[in-house]
Amino acid sequence: IDNISGNLFEDQKGFQGLHQDLKFLENYPYIEKFLRNLFCYQCDTQKEADERLLWVLAWMSKSFVNYDKRRTAIVIHGAEGTGKDTFVNLFFKRYFSEKFCSVVSNEELKSNFTSQKLASCLLCQMNEIKGDFRDGNTVFDKIKTLITEREFKYELKGQNSLYLPCYFNVIICSNDTKPIQVSDTARRYSVF
């Protein structure tokens, strides 16, 4: 798959136009199968699956080409071994490099201090998130802020806090069946 994804990057010139149709995926059957297994397994029709896959590819394309903050997080939940980390590693870490892709745990989000990893990343993978739906849940509020705001409070232990630009997009991965609280009107999350 590593060689295949490398060719995909070269052929698509940084993913420009990637999200316009799925025909180009015919040249990458393993990647197409992987993406469909990860994002379309709950779809009832081919049309629904294609629309869902196009949405994911558009999200990726705009992240890669414009380094655009999408203000909507991709939430991937499922059993172990479904490919959540592989998706991030195969596409995002390969494109942005490990240096600009940060993995933040549930425990780091619970902390009063900000993970130093967030200061310079372009993609934040929130890994093994577990839903805590009590009122006043600071993790839930922190996640919402990191997804949508253009700045975030950067607070290190023993130092004054400051606000930094928030360029990164968020992918939330979890084995939990309900990793995050999403209402019917939520605009911040696309759950797969």
Predicted ranges, named:
Residues 2-129, 139-140, 190-192:
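P-loop NTPase catalytic core of nucleic-acid-dependent motor ATPases
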Residues 181-192:
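A short helix-turn-beta junction within AAA+ P-loop NTPase domains corresponding to the substrate/partner-engaging
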Residues 130-131, 175-179:
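Conserved nucleotide-binding/hydrolysis micro-motifs of P-loop NTPases
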Residues 33, 37-43, 149-153, 170-173:
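A Trp-anchored, charged/polar loop motif used as the substrate-binding/catalytic surface
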Residues 113-119, 155-173:
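AAA+/SF3 P-loop NTPase mechanochemical coupling elements
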Residues 139-163:
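Conserved catalytic/switch belt of AAA+ P-loop NTPases
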